[in-house]
Amino acid sequence: MRTGERLHRAVPAVAIVALLAGALTLALAAGQASPAKQATFEASAVRILTEAPLVDGHNDVPEQLRDRVKDHLDRLDLASDTSSLDPPMQTDIPRLRKGHVGGQFWSVYVPTSLHGPEAVQAVFEQIDVVHRMAERYPETFAMAYTAGDVERIFRSGRIACLIGMEGGHSIGNSLAVLREAYTCGARYLTLTHWDDTDWADAATDKARHDGLTKFGREVVREMNRLGMLVDLSHVSDKTMLDALETSEAPVIFSHSSARALCNHVRNVPDHILRRVAANGGIVMVNFAPGFISEEVRIAEKPLEAEWTRLENLYPNDPKRVTAELRAWKAQHPLPNATLAQVADHIDHIRDVAGIDHVGLGSDFDGISRTPVGLEDVSKYPALVAELLRRGYSPDDVKKIVGGNVLRVMREVEKTAARLQKTRLPSEALIEELDVPATVPDHATPLGTDSR
């Protein structure tokens, strides 16, 4: 006789009922809603996302189009199921619709191995591909340049396409390039990527400037004048502080999480969260498992070392790097983060900075792994349901999914309108403000992209 059978026979029926009731109570206390209650949360989540736009701060589909098909949109149909590709993508139009996405900042990313004219060309090619996406699927996408545009496009039943530039190296140390990128639709600039720029320190490189240089501060001021969001994801803590001190408008972290919960330098420490609240800005939670789970962050260190080794071994063969890295992962399984842990980061940022200063910046299609329960862009309703289960009100959820970033956009637009009345375009040059101009020790051909 099995132990379970013996226990079942020994327990009276009344006691069994009591045990089951107790188990249900414990399950609810542990955060598991009853099936009926969970269905209510899920239905409410969908209703909320039909009433208010979900605006995600960071998605790398443009990079995928460049790397997979050299920007040939006729070779990769976003209206089809891209999860069947090798490797699978996390974004396509059917899944965007299922996820009730209302607006998306598409990242126009340039590898940090590119500098000067090469970087500028690459970023404008990425900007161009976002415009062509919107033109190719007009029934689904429309370009947006203001908060009002996002809301208008959402009401029309389409998805607002916004552009975010990832990495200050992509402006080629030129404020004129920055202005032209804005004219072409870019609405945020991430001041650095993995490596320092000539005017700002990154979180993941050696600090060479002690934050922002004089030219770096001028970049922030010109962004304020233009109406471009200052994005502090990827930058060092000192760069965060310098930008917060310099900016006259609210800042954003387009895809970062809470360092108190996962001690990654890409995440935001509590003292900065409080400064973001005072600034009126927003931290948009990144879904990368290594930024969400401390266990995963520690476990991923050997993976990062292997990735670096393969990139150095095959610098001109990214497909081989991807294939060998996939084989390495198969032999070295890693733990994963969960949807609930993503919600924990939202909780923490709300608790430290306030409900008005947290949003979503998934980094889909820029991350190779995703949390359990947040596998792709179709899963946003599940995250919203989890927030409702935790007691967030519908109004607070609407702030998190899009209301907060739209508020920040409006404030940035208002600041720009005010500054443009008294301030002409900056004519500052890096060689005049920062003497001598620094040259990154990772610049081509001395190094490779650390991504």
Name these PLM-found stretches.
Residues 3-17:
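Bacterial N-terminal signal peptides that target proteins for export
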Residues 54-61, 235, 253-257:
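Histidine-centered catalytic micro-motifs
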Residues 218-232, 236-242, 272-278, 348:
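Substrate-binding cleft of carbohydrate-active enzyme catalytic domains
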